[in-house]
Amino acid sequence: MIKVQTKWLERAQRIRAIAQAGLAFSKDVYDRERYEELMKLSAEMMADYSEKDIEVITDLWQGEKGYPTPKADVRGAVFRENQILLVREKHDELWSLPGGFCEIGLSPAENVVKEIKEESGYDTEPSRLLAVLDSHKHSHPPQPYHYYKIFIACSMTDGQGETGIETNHAAFFPEDRLPPLSPKRNTPSQLSMLFDFLRHPDKKTIFD
């Protein structure tokens, strides 16, 4: 059932992408009307196969203009004494790697340093790109957007554990005692991948 649900969500995202691109470039009034109808249809499909109301989805998509592309989500892998840094999100009390959407004007490396500082209080320095993964190819729950997830290894340089606007705890965990994870942000297999990089420093970058 999950695979069927995911496939329909991917189709809804694809229909929405085609419609949004059409609205960005088409001047024909009739074509634009058809693209608007496709946008509504894709929102209805998304609502049917996700946990979000159609109004929420419509609001999320309202400001999206131009040619659609996947969103970039960057996550920092910070280790200390063979334990990985995780932060707990306030709104669901689940744990994730520090990170978030890439902001315009900042590189992925600059973004991850900023996110780690804001969410955990630690100053870090990016050292290596570990992986670039497609959210559709991993066991994330259904979501309205398509993401490329960027994992960057970072070394701690200063600071102490502090919480941010979106987080209420930051702590280091060993691989065999991980807390409840936020599956839309990171999966158990992705955490295992990062610990594997720790054990094998010469491991090649992984990408989908």
Swiss-Prot record:
Q: What happens without the gene?
A: Cells lacking this gene have an unchanged spontaneous mutation frequency, even in triple mutT/yjhB/yvcI disruptions.
Query: What role does this protein play?
Result: Probably mediates the hydrolysis of some nucleoside diphosphate derivatives.
Which InterPro entries is this protein grouped with?
NUDIX_hydrolase-like_dom_sf, NUDIX_hydrolase_dom
Please report the organism this UniProt entry assigns to the protein. Bacillus subtilis (strain 168)
Query: Which cofactor names does the annotation list?
Result: Mg(2+); Mn(2+)
Q: Which CDD domains match?
A: NUDIX_CDP-Chase_like
**UniProt entry keywords in alphabetical sequence:** Hydrolase, Magnesium, Manganese, Metal-binding
Enzyme Commission designation: 3.6.1.-
Per the annotation, the residue ranges of the short sequence motif Nudix box are 100-121
Provide the top EC class. hydrolase
Enumerate the GO terms in the molecular function aspect. hydrolase activity; metal ion binding
Q: Hydrolase among the record's keywords?
A: yes
PANTHER family documented for this protein: ADP-RIBOSE PYROPHOSPHATASE YJHB-RELATED (PTHR43046:SF16), GDP-MANNOSE MANNOSYL HYDROLASE (PTHR43046)
One Pfam family here: Nudix_N
What is the name of this protein? Answer: Putative ADP-ribose pyrophosphatase YjhB
Q: Which family does it belong to?
A: Belongs to the Nudix hydrolase family.
Question: Gene encoding this polypeptide?
Answer: yjhB
> Which residues does the annotation say bind Mg(2+)?
115, 119
Q: Which residues form the Nudix hydrolase domain?
A: 69-195
